[in-house]
């Protein structure tokens, strides 16, 4: 088996949903394949030097599947946990294939991942997680009225938002640990993992939600004792006064400093919270920035690096 530094701790890389499907692009399979090819090139550069575990977003994809389900009148729409599992399989397959092509001889494994949430989490009463395509205000208002969706602003447009409870426990963690120890590059916890609760009989049961993939990545990185966490998105770092004339990028900062500011709940906010949690609990670093600058972020030459 060809793998780098098997005795060192991994870097956990979280790919934003926009790294897989850029804003404004139609959610077609060939377009996503092309974007995943680009993402795999960036991940492979890191994986040649470090052990790597990859997670990814699924917001556009799970939203598309939900829309398709709404259009099929012959059966009830599939619940969000099932749709999340479908996207985890699809995106994981495409990522694994591209990574195997980029890293000949390297074991690459995709693992469906269930993550326990609290059924009493207040997030179930206040949806914040954007999924699906971007709409104009007029389109969003019409869909909210027709389908009973919760809608919120996201960038220059509007998207459907769903419940996003806190990730508490990763069911497949022991298996992930074994795979990492073996030297495999693991793709797991895609889309934040499949949200489940423990029922009265002590078994697992899926719930209607989408876990934030950055918070899930932080929990995964903490549990794996990762040497670092890399949150990759379509902006080049964390900004104070974003989208104003006074915007300023934090190049190197601390959780204490970042917690002084407010960031958008559906986009940069979870990334900052994930970074702070990981750094505070482990004493390791977290980088936030653009996919094509991933190696430079690790080297402290790009993006925002959060340190203890």
From Swiss-Prot:
Main location: cytoplasm
Keywords per UniProt: ATP-binding, Cytoplasm, Kinase, Nucleotide-binding, Transferase
Gene behind this protein: arcC
Protein name: Carbamate kinase
Species the sequence originates in: Synechocystis sp. (strain ATCC 27184 / PCC 6803 / Kazusa)
Catalytic activity: hydrogencarbonate + NH4(+) + ATP = carbamoyl phosphate + ADP + H2O + H(+)
GO biological process, any: proline biosynthetic process
UniProt subcellular location: Cytoplasm
Family membership noted in the UniProt record: Belongs to the carbamate kinase family.
Any single Gene Ontology cellular-component annotation: cytosol
Enzyme Commission code: 2.7.2.2
One example GO MF annotation: ATP binding
Pfam family name, one: AA_kinase
